[in-house]
């Protein structure tokens, strides 16, 4: 089991506290394993596992607990039997109707430490904000980073070089279960395709009561094909009209919002770096796992530049950065990254194979006058740093402990 220390470092200070720990992320990204890791850490700190109550609401044996009252009654009864402080672990809590009322009541009435997971960003809005406002901390869990992937892949192929590991990562992505399939191509693609269908059906269509399945599938296919490119709902509406589908841009944006709430896509806003304002249109979208893209759409190697961008973007999110696309004049910076007092800029490209490419990638920083770190990241093996702008091989960049 991968320790996932990046997340445990953030969660550890909250272990045993009265704050509710909420872990969200796309289906099958490893949230259940995080609950196991937390239980393991608590046990090592002296907590008896007899004090744990763990329920996975996708398990049919708990189907009788899918209302707030039924769950509350069951947990209250079991807590009395255990006596003392109890540690509650609820996996995929969104399957329980009005679950936030139950969680709030348990928080108030029991001596307990609560951990929950869910596959929808709306988990933390609406009713939850009303009942639990200021009483929870959220941790977004992502598929494996390249470093985590390489650790597992080398347990299967111990002689694999870093280059070979990265080549596999480009196609397989970071979904944890693939290690159980030993990263075999056909079973891995089948698993990822089925996972994609499950996210589309359970977390997007059913949750949002979408009836126009064909339209949803077309919109998702379009975004997957165009990850990392500037998006316009109006342009997509025109494209669909040419295919005899008349749809309003607002409907398209709503459907994409549902996909983002299910953590299938991430939206990246564009920022005017000179005017220091977020632009209202032409955002970009990246997919939660590029392995899913390869399984359902293909073409990761053909679209290598966009896939490298996708990989770097997810790594920036993992490390806690808020990310925008920067615009300065007629130039664009792939990622402008902020985290408290930290800031850095990242340009991503496939290869710096010509003077034109070098000038474009490094020249994007010409009008940025601050002293924050500026990177150009590519698959090139040789360091081409210049004028204070750091060039890094993408593998080294992803594996670095920190960027400075």
Where are these regions (language model features)?
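Catalytic cores of nucleic-acid endonucleases
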Residues: 326, 350-395
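Conserved lysine of the Walker
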Residues: 31
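Hydrophobic anchor at the beta1->P-loop junction of P-loop NTPases
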Residues: 23
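Hydrophobic positions on the alpha1 helix immediately C-terminal to the Walker A/P-loop
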Residues: 34, 38
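Interdomain motor-coupling "hinge/lid" segment immediately C-terminal to the ATP-binding subdomain
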Residues: 121, 126-230, 263
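Short glycine-rich substrate-engagement loop in P-loop NTPases that contacts/grips substrate
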Residues: 54-84
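Pre-Walker A adenine-sensing motif
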Residues: 2-16
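Accessory nucleic acid-recognition modules appended to NTPase machines
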Residues: 183-343
């Amino acid at each position: 089991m991968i320790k996932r220390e990046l997340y445990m470092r953030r969660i550890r200070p909250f272990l045993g506290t009265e704050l509710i720990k909420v872990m969200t992320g796309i289906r099958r990204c490893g949230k259940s394993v995080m609950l196991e890791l937390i239980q393991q850490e608590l046990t090592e700190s002296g907590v008896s596992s007899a004090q744990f109550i763990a329920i996975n609401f996708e398990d049919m044996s708990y189907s009788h607990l899918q209302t707030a009252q039924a769950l509350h009654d069951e947990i209250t009864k079991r807590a009395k039997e255990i006596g003392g402080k109890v540690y509650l672990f609820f996996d995929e809590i969104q399957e329980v109707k009005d679950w936030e009322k139950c969680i709030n009541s348990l928080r108030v009435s029991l001596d307990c430490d609560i951990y929950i997971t869910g596959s929808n960003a709306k988990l933390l809005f609406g009713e939850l904000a009303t009942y639990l406002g200021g009483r929870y901390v959220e941790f977004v869990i992502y598929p494996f980073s390249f470093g985590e992937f390489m650790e597992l892949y080398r347990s299967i192929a111990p002689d694999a070089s870093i280059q070979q590991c990265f080549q596999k990562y480009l196609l397989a992505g970071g979904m944890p279960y693939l290690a159980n399939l030993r990263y075999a191509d056909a079973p891995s693609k089948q698993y990822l395709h089925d996972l994609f269908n499950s996210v589309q059906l359970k977390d997007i269509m059913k949750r949002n009561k979408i009836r126009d399945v064909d339209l949803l599938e077309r919109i998702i296919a379009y975004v997957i094909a165009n990850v990392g490119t500037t998006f316009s709902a109006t342009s997509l509406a025109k494209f669909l009209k040419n295919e005899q589908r008349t749809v309003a841009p607002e409907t398209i944006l709503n459907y994409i919002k549902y996909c983002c709430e299910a953590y299938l896509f991430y939206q990246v806003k564009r920022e005017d770096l000179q005017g220091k304002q977020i632009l209202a249109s032409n955002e970009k979208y990246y997919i939660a796992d590029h392995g899913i893209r390869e399984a359902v759409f293909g073409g990761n190697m053909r679209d290598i530049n966009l896939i490298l961008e996708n990989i770097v973007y997810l790594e920036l999110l993992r490390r806690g950065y808020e990310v925008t696309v920067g615009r300065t004049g007629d130039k664009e910076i792939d990622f402008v990254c902020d985290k408290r007092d930290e800031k850095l800029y990242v340009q991503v490209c496939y290869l710096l194979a010509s003077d034109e490419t070098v000038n474009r990638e490094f020249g994007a920083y010409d009008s940025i006058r601050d002293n924050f770190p500026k990177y150009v990241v590519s698959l090139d093996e040789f360091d081409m740093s210049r004028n204070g702008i750091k060039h890094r091989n993408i593998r080294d960049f992803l594996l670095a402990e920190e960027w400075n």
